[in-house]
């Protein structure tokens, strides 16, 4: 594996945007019947769905199948996007987001271990965890009983955690959407992903059930108006730029699609190569997945801000919150307990004043 990691490290490098193609591919034999296929694409021409499409088409071609002709090309989508900006529906979406983020925008202030770099650092690591099966079952039940989704339940719990740690009751969380709103877009390779900046305002005198209803409605509205580019929103809001932070939010929440990534053919099988995680696109990103009823998660965190012990503690507190709301969703947010007495390395020594 160390040899494979060395190949990958030498393979992945910056692209010159002035020179096509923004794609490189390499196949290396690492054993008698083992190969490493590497492909590197600039994010402006691809997204996660694109990667899956490439693998699926590669499998079809390997088996001698003909690829289905595409109904449209990415350039058609780009033209449609430009035309869409002139329509009234686009103006309605713009109005929604400007209203949603009106007023003074909150800046998330989590306790950190080290001084924030003057310029954003993308050095990071990942910490993975699994939620107890009984708690997972309870969370699924809450989602079903409240007419919400597991995504909404987990996102709401995450905002409670952030509010407990930051002492803030006004938060903006980023969440990605695939952006492929038409079936014709599904098989295309290109950059369709948009990120939604969703505002959350948990209050200590609310029950989790009540807060979840608010979060559900807010999330549904955001997804209804998802087809409005984040970069356009940042420009319209005229956010004061700070080189040490993202313009609108410093944390993301993602619920991952857990389709099997291993493919087996008659004479070949392949699966993703798992490499040690060393980047963090934001201060903190919580990614969750639901695999056959079992909820798993991971924190991607900036190592210039947080120590590993701090993230382990954050994880324990998240699981504690999930356990408490799983047992009693009518618990007041202010009564939800976290392990605030523990002070591991990795957070600043200042006490954490909880808002609840």
Roles of regions detected by a PLM:
Residues 3-7:
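Alpha-helical sensor/transducer elements of the RecA-like P-loop NTPase core
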Residues 8-16, 21-30, 40-44, 56-64, ...:
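Adenylate-forming
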Residues 47:
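A Lys-centered signature of the CheY-like receiver
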Residues 50:
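Receiver (REC) domain switch/active-site region of two-component response regulators
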Residues 92-97:
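Thiotemplate assembly-line natural product biosynthesis machinery
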């Amino acid at each position: 594996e160390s040899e494979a990691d060395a190949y990958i490290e030498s393979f992945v490098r910056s692209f010159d945007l002035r020179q096509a193609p923004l794609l490189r591919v390499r196949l290396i034999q690492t054993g008698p019947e083992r190969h490493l296929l590497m492909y590197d694409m600039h994010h402006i021409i691809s997204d996660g769905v694109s990667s899956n499409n490439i693998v699926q088409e590669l499998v079809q071609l390997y088996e001698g199948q003909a690829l289905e002709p595409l109904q449209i090309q990415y350039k058609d989508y780009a033209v449609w996007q430009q035309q869409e900006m002139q329509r009234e529906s686009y103006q309605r979406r713009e109005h929604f987001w400007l209203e949603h983020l009106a007023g003074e925008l909150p800046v998330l202030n989590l306790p950190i271990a080290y001084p924030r770099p003057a310029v954003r650092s993308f050095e990071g690591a990942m910490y993975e965890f699994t939620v107890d099966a009984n708690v997972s079952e309870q969370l699924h039940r809450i989602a079903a009983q409240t007419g919400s989704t597991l995504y909404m339940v987990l996102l709401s719990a995450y905002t409670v955690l952030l509010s407990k740690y930051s002492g803030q009751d006004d938060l903006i969380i980023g969440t990605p959407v695939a952006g492929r709103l038409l079936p014709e877009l599904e098989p295309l390779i290109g950059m369709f992903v948009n990120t939604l900046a969703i505002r959350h305002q948990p209050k200590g005198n609310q029950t989790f059930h009540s807060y979840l209803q608010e979060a559900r409605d807010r999330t549904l509205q955001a997804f209804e108006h998802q087809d409005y580019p984040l970069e356009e929103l940042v420009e319209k809001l005229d956010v004061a730029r700070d080189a040490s932070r993202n313009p609108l939010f410093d944390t993301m929440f993602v619920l991952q699609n857990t389709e099997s990534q291993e493919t087996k053919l008659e004479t070949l099988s392949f699966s993703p190569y798992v490499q040690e995680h060393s980047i963090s696109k934001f201060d903190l990103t919580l990614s969750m997945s639901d695999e056959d009823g079992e909820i798993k998660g991971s924190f991607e965190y900036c190592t210039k801000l947080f120590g590993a012990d701090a993230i382990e503690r954050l994880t324990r507190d998240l699981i504690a919150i999930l356990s408490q709301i799983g047992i009693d969703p009518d618990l007041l947010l202010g009564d939800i307990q976290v392990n605030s007495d523990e002070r591991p390395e990795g957070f600043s020594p200042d006490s954490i004043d909880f808002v609840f």
